[in-house]
Amino acid sequence: MTPQDLKDVMSSGLLSFPVTDFDSNGNFNAKGYAARLEWLAPYGASALFAAGGTGEYFSLYGEEYGQIIKTAVDTCRGKVPIIAGAGGPTRTAIAHAQEAERLGAHGVLLLPHYLTEAGQEGLIAHVEQVCKSVKFGVIVYNRDRTRFTPESLAILAERCPNLVGFKDGMGNIETMSAIFMKMGDRFAYLGGLPTAEVYAAAYKALGTPVYSSAVFNFIPKTAMAFYEAVRTDDMATQHKLLKEFFMPYLKIRNRVEGYGVSIIKAGAKLVGHDAGPVRAPLTDLKPSELEELKALIDKLGPQ
């Protein structure tokens, strides 16, 4: 897939980040992960992100990364494109991006670097080195310590033809407007705030109609229905689902830092697609919280 092909894929439809399956000892469960992807692939997502934030990229080590990407690529070949996550220190991000390309992934989402602060010149150097280390398309993730100005993105766009996507996880309306006005159709734009459905209509108004859905991991039918409501400006359906599911869901998710991933694995377990526990430092939902989540899921009906 060429960078332009990746940009085209990222420009429409719903995206999602499958959770990564671990066994009871916390080791990668390739069989379970393949079964998960086989279940999710037919629901119609434009692309799936392997080893992304929801896939606990931050906890992976050693050979696990390659095993996860290979399992995803092999399982979804001919069904749905696979975009690999890569991040952390520049050399780690480069190594993972190159491995993902070698294994047949269709592009890479460049996740934030770790721990240290960096100015715009440093961020530009980081992204440029990763982009120039691979031939396939790169999407940069704007969040946490990795926050780009419109001017920095313009420099990167000129230097890196294979940088084709911008995913926003900050939600700063003024900055997003400035980026969109400056860069126009040079990038595909993705909404990437946690529980993106809550912000989907606002992002669409900014020129960013595409977003990644975490709840697709356990309520894929509802996730696709919500995306269709956003696409067609069906506000009645959006408001109904926001009121009945997403807003009470947020109350559970926001109780503990890190629950943004934990609640997704909990949901998958409740619908019969258990992905195992989250890895430390994340913690799983408490039994009472599982019951709360189950009640919300049950109201939605079969998926």
Swiss-Prot record:
It comes from the Bacteria. Keywords: Lyase. NCBIfam families: KdgD, PRK03620.1. Its EC number is 4.2.1.41. This is Probable 5-dehydro-4-deoxyglucarate dehydratase. GO terms for molecular function: 4-hydroxy-tetrahydrodipicolinate synthase activity; 5-dehydro-4-deoxyglucarate dehydratase activity. Belongs to the DapA family. It catalyses: 5-dehydro-4-deoxy-D-glucarate + H(+) = 2,5-dioxopentanoate + CO2 + H2O. One of its GO terms (biological process) is D-glucarate catabolic process. Transmembrane segments: none annotated. Pathway: Carbohydrate acid metabolism; D-glucarate degradation; 2,5-dioxopentanoate from D-glucarate: step 2/2.
